[in-house]
Amino acid sequence: MKTWIYLALMMSLNFNWAQAADKDGPALKFVEAAAKAFREGKTDEALKLAAKAVEAEPKNLNLHYFKGQLHSKLRQHAKAAAAYTRVLALKPEKDRVADTHQERGEAYFKLGKIKESIADFDVFIKAYPRQDPHHWQRGISYYYANEFKKGYEQFERHQTVNRNDVENAVWHFLCLARAKGIKEAKAKLIPIVGDGRVPMMEVLALFGGKSTPAKVLAKARGGGVKGARLERQLFYAHLYLGLWYEATKEKKLRDQYIGLAAAVADNHDYMGDVARVHAELNKIPVPKVKAEK
């Protein structure tokens, strides 16, 4: 499965965090065994081994971080947040403090703890001011915290470093529509050229008043694509149709499309979590859907 390849890569990227204080001690051996089990898809075994590593060296903050990463990849967000909180309690050096707040902020967002996510993202950005324009995650959190002015300003800054992303234009629109009305949001829709992801340019046209929901869905289903690619294209169509209907205050249609997006949330990274959190915060029923063929 491509998912496991990705997760194994992520685990290897973070492996240096997990180096035990005693390189010949039991903790490192548990970490190595946990990483191996994870790569083989033996997730329960990996979690047990990571827990044993922490038990062997409970004051080694790197092991708690490793455990948090493992829980995060397995979408166990409450346990991930708890592990990152333990890292911070062990008083890491400045850079690791910031990185841990970023990781915990993402976990908090995925738990629907929006204000807590913003607080953690703020700590990260204070430590790394140059990351501010890159931080679209904080912009999305601002939307769900009803801090719409801060939201559209965040996406305006993000536009300076990510010029061809329809999603940035849409989230800017959504925040501006809530702050100043949909008429002004349409007038100030950020122009995007060159987002090659289907159906994102059609989504942009919809928000600009130059397309329709039916055309967005047709574009997502077009081209003879099947399987995971079709699911991904429909996921983005459903998510942004749901957000469009939220902006136009059509609650029934919003719920329909957000529900469809949330139904496959686990397959679509952070934006999948956005769909799921949106459904949870608004108590939107999530249907069971069959895999796209």
At which residue positions do the language-model features occur?
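Canonical positions in the second alpha-helix
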Residues: K52-A53, R86-L90, V123-F124, R157-H158, ...
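Start-of-helix register in tetratricopeptide repeats
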Residues: L28, N62, D95-D99, P133, ...
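Short coil turns that delineate tetratricopeptide repeat
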Residues: D24, P58, P92-D95, P129, ...
